[in-house]
UniProtKB/Swiss-Prot annotation:
Mg(2+) 1 binds at D253, E266. This is D-alanine--D-alanine ligase. Binds 2 magnesium or manganese ions per subunit. It comes from Alcanivorax borkumensis (strain ATCC 700651 / DSM 11573 / NCIMB 13689 / SK2). Pathway: Cell wall biogenesis; peptidoglycan biosynthesis. It catalyses: 2 D-alanine + ATP = D-alanyl-D-alanine + ADP + phosphate + H(+). Residues 110-299 form the ATP-grasp domain.
Amino acid sequence: MDKRALKERLSRVGRVAVLAGGRSAERAVSLKSGAAVHAGLRNLGLLAELVDPADKSVDTLRGFDAAFIALHGRGGEDGVIQGVLEHLEIPYTGSGVMASAIGMDKVRTKQLWKGAGLPTPAFYVAGREEAELGFPVIVKPAHEGSSIGMAKADNTEELGEALVAAEKFDQDVLVEAWVNGPEYTVAVLGDEALPAIRLQTPHVFYDFEAKYQSDSTEYLCPAGLDDADEQALRTLALTAFRVAGCRGWGRVDVMRDEQGQWQLLEVNTVPGMTDHSLVPMAAKATGRDFDVLVGEILLDALERGRG
């Protein structure tokens, strides 16, 4: 949308709370996302204010006309703050309570996708069930984001060590078959799947350091796919997003295995909005600058709130 037209449509919005920080393991990333979103909304002429739920009571939110959620991880991406905002009848960005809770749970998300016949790597939940996946595998805390607590295991000894490390972050730990192949991510904005991004890192996988601290990670957009593969990937991502019940905006992570098949990894209902983040990169490929991106995300929330 043209920035001038967007400003006009947002001109009657009152106070907007930009929720960032929180108490999750992703607090530092959330603060960076919040600062960027806050600046973008102010550039559109909006009365945006940063609110950190770790420092202020939820009563602080009374009197705001809308909320832009930039909280990552527990308490912000799992349906908790969404439930608070529903109770306060404040329109908010992104997915609703249930879809946020599902999206934060890698196991539930994969079960939904599997039930819908969508492709996702074989997996089991450590301590609850076992499956013969062989090696290598990747171990993931079920309710953490930003690749926190994740590790690759090439043998039984490494698997044991990875499980111990992951259990420091989560009592539920996912063990997933390792996929050899390139990793992609597809941002979703409303009903639109944005251009895919291919992620290339010298790390074993796209871990926390590769995401937020490394200068050696490469992001390719266009992703180097032919038109048919690009469209197939975008369609799969949009379908996976909808099957999980998500709305507004988000991101779906996908890999391509050695047989050339797409494999869904996870959905992100509140993706990062830092200078390393992928949604702004995909939006830029469509001609949207950062201010327009955050404005469109907020406008979607307001229009749903009115509906």
